[in-house]
């Protein structure tokens, strides 16, 4: 059975610098979407950056980067859960745990998302999206369990509807 689910997320990060007689404040808002599509998790995100400069002149520069996407195979994910974070900012977080340290390499980095640990992708959720986060984690866990069951039975993964033999119902 092919699983599908989608979950939006929003990240914020900022950086302030004082150099000589100039103050620079940069604020980035990252709007993203996690999408479970069969045996892959797609992570899409767009960075909107606002840079305020105060010095000889006062100005604000705004920039929106193009959408980036990373595809993570389910075979590199060990699990998913929604946790409550009590530290600032408190709220629900979706945590994807990697089965391979290379799982989140495409997502992390200077142009990507910041990871506190290379084996965990923790994404803050809006409080209104907590139930949606639990549903996404459940769908992902179900897809992982079905993969493990198929591997234990020695069966190939269930055919997806777009493969030619998936809908073959010949009784002859």
List the model feature ranges, each with a label.
Residues 2-6, 29-31, 60-172:
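Acidic, Ser/Thr- and proline-rich intrinsically disordered linker/docking segments
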Residues 1-58, 63-66:
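Anionic N-terminal interaction surfaces
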């Amino acid at each position: 059975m092919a699983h599908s689910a989608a979950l939006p997320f929003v990240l914020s990060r900022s950086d302030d610098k004082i150099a000589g007689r100039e103050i620079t404040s940069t604020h980035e808002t990252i709007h993203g979407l996690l999408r479970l599509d069969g045996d892959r998790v797609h992570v899409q995100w767009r960075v909107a950056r606002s840079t305020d400069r105060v010095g000889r002149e006062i100005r604000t520069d705004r920039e929106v980067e193009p959408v980036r996407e990373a595809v993570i195979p389910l075979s590199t994910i060990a699990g998913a859960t929604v946790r409550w974070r009590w530290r600032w900012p408190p709220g629900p977080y979706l945590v994807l745990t990697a089965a391979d340290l290379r799982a989140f390499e495409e997502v992390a980095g200077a142009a990507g998302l910041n990871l506190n640990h290379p084996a965990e992708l923790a994404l803050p959720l809006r409080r209104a999206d907590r139930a949606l986060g639990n549903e996404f984690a459940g769908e992902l866990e179900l897809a992982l369990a079905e993969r493990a069951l198929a591997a234990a039975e020695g069966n190939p993964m269930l055919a997806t509807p777009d493969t030619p033999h998936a809908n073959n119902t010949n009784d002859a």
